[in-house]
Amino acid sequence: MKLCVTVLSLLMLVAAFCSPALSAPMGSDPPTACCFSYTARKLPRNFVVDYYETSSLCSQPAVVFQTKRSKQVCADPSESWVQEYVYDLELN
């Protein structure tokens, strides 16, 4: 029992020091979400509720669509349907 308490305490201590909030220097930007591949299919427009563009720090540009089911789907910003969806979302 004493060993379990010691191991659990040690694991909690390690987890606290490995926390992303503690490992980043103060004032630094949060981790950036990047896309490494795009969806091969056009999403149904009624599934998409929001979008954002990936950071310029990413290796390739992307538009990330948020779906009604809270999924995030990476899309190629040069595709015409992606540009149409972004335009439509900006208007609404």
From Swiss-Prot:
The protein's UniProt keywords, in alphabetical order, are: Chemotaxis, Cytokine, Disulfide bond, Inflammatory response, Secreted, Signal
Q: Among the record's GO biological process terms, what is one?
A: positive regulation of natural killer cell chemotaxis
- Record CDD domains: Chemokine_CC
Subcellular localization? Secreted
Q: Which family does it belong to?
A: Belongs to the intercrine beta (chemokine CC) family.
Name the job this protein performs.
Monokine with inflammatory and chemokinetic properties. Binds to CCR5. One of the major HIV-suppressive factors produced by CD8+ T-cells. Recombinant MIP-1-beta induces a dose-dependent inhibition of different strains of HIV-1, HIV-2, and simian immunodeficiency virus (SIV). The processed form MIP-1-beta(3-69) retains the abilities to induce down-modulation of surface expression of the chemokine receptor CCR5 and to inhibit the CCR5-mediated entry of HIV-1 in T-cells. MIP-1-beta(3-69) is also a ligand for CCR1 and CCR2 isoform B.
- Protein name, per record: C-C motif chemokine 4
| Name of the gene encoding the protein in the UniProt record | CCL4
